Amino acid sequence: MSFKGNPKVQKVMVQPINLIFRYLQNRSRVQVWLYENISLRIEGHIVGFDEYMNLVLDDAEEVYVKTRQRRNLGRIMLKGDNITLIQNVSPTKD
C-alpha cells in the first residue's frame, strides 16, 4: 500500500517577541509602520525592546512615503502604542 497525497506537516508557531529578538540579534534594518500616520515610516536597527513592544532604534530615520524623503533621527525610543507593523528591510533574508 503506497501513500498518496501530502504527508501531514506540522508548522511551528513563531512568537512575535522571538522575531523581534532575531532582528535585534542579526542587527537587521527594520521599517516600522506607525499607528494612524500612514504618510511616515521609521527605519532603524533594533538595539532594545520590552514586553510592551517599546523599541530602541539606532541609526533611525523618518521616511516619508510619498516623497521618499528621509530625515536622520539618530537613536530613539519608539513607544509600542505607535507601532502597527515591523518589517525587515535588510538586503539579506532572516
From Swiss-Prot:
Gene3D superfamilies per record: 2.30.30.100
Start and end residues of each Sm domain: 17-92
GO BP annotations, alphabetical order: mRNA splicing, via spliceosome; spliceosomal snRNP assembly
Alphabetized UniProt keyword annotations: Cytoplasm, mRNA processing, mRNA splicing, Nucleus, Ribonucleoprotein, RNA-binding, Spliceosome
PANTHER family cross-referenced by the UniProt entry: SMALL NUCLEAR RIBONUCLEOPROTEIN E
Subunit organization: Core component of the spliceosomal U1, U2, U4 and U5 small nuclear ribonucleoproteins (snRNPs), the building blocks of the spliceosome. Interacts with the SMN complex.
Function text: Plays a role in pre-mRNA splicing as a core component of the spliceosomal U1, U2, U4 and U5 small nuclear ribonucleoproteins (snRNPs), the building blocks of the spliceosome.
Name the UniProt record assigns to this protein: Probable small nuclear ribonucleoprotein E
Name of the coding gene: SmE
